Amino acid sequence: MNLKKITALMIGAVMAVSMAVPAMADDKVETVTDGKLTVATSPDFAPYEFYSIDEDGNPSLAGFDMDLAKYIADKMGLELEVIPMDFDGVLSELSQKNVDLGMAGLSPDPAREDAMDFSDIYYEGGQSFVTVKDKADKFTKLEDANNKDYSIGAQTGSIQLDLANENTPDADIVSLPKVTDIITELLTGKMDGAFIETAVAESYQKNYPDLEIVCDVPYDTEGSAIGVAKGNEALLKAVNEAIAD
């Protein structure tokens, strides 16, 4: 699913609620809790998932992962339950089958395939190396970050952490549980650079113009998929059908 289709999904989310067709009885999908679709997410990953202030002034989950989760649940005739947690918690809960889906801008890394199944790609994105404007001239190319004098960040348990270890093994690599923590470290000068998913980096850059996206980071498996509880073929099929719509 490309970005244009994701945008259309967000605009049509309200329509999808009324138009959704519940799953037929003979196509019943087993879930962690009967009648519910339980989704784990890490709401520090705008524009995928984040906290937004609603009309009553209260924080509520938003983002196109959340719109997609709602669409899938409605299409299956299930109530949506979203459980926020750190990113590594999403991976852990899904691998233990405590939740049905993990939606947190997941990359379908082959190293994760023993712990979960992956849906089809629903958004094609990339990876970026990010710093602040005052330090941008230090990183004219990605190789410049591979220096023991630099502190380089990435989210704990993420593909970005793998990319940091692969591309900057000589640097002081720091893993933090939330992307918001990484952004804070960059802006306060405690961290020199970081590996961040491109759409996420662009989203933070809109709010924090001191951030600078220096370059793209090569990565073979570019794109985001939904993590599905391992072995639940019926659920995986239902998720892929929703993505294809």
Q: Where do the language-model regions lie?
A:
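Periplasmic-binding protein-like
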Residues: 124-133, 198, 202-243
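Short helix-initiation/N-cap motifs at beta->coil->alpha
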Residues: 64-66, 81-93, 137, 174-188, ...
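Extracytoplasmic small-molecule ligand-binding "clamshell" domains
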Residues: 27-106
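Alpha-to-beta junction loops
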Residues: 77-79, 95-104, 149-151, 178, ...
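A ligand-binding cleft/hinge motif common to bilobed small-molecule-binding domains
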Residues: 88-89, 106-115, 162-166, 187-220
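A conserved helix-loop-strand patch within extracytoplasmic ligand-binding domains
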Residues: 78, 89, 107-108, 119-161, ...
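Ligand-binding cleft/hinge of the Venus flytrap
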Residues: 50-56, 69-77, 142, 159-177, ...
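Extended ligand-binding regions for polar small-molecule ligands
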Residues: 66-75, 133-135, 143, 149, ...
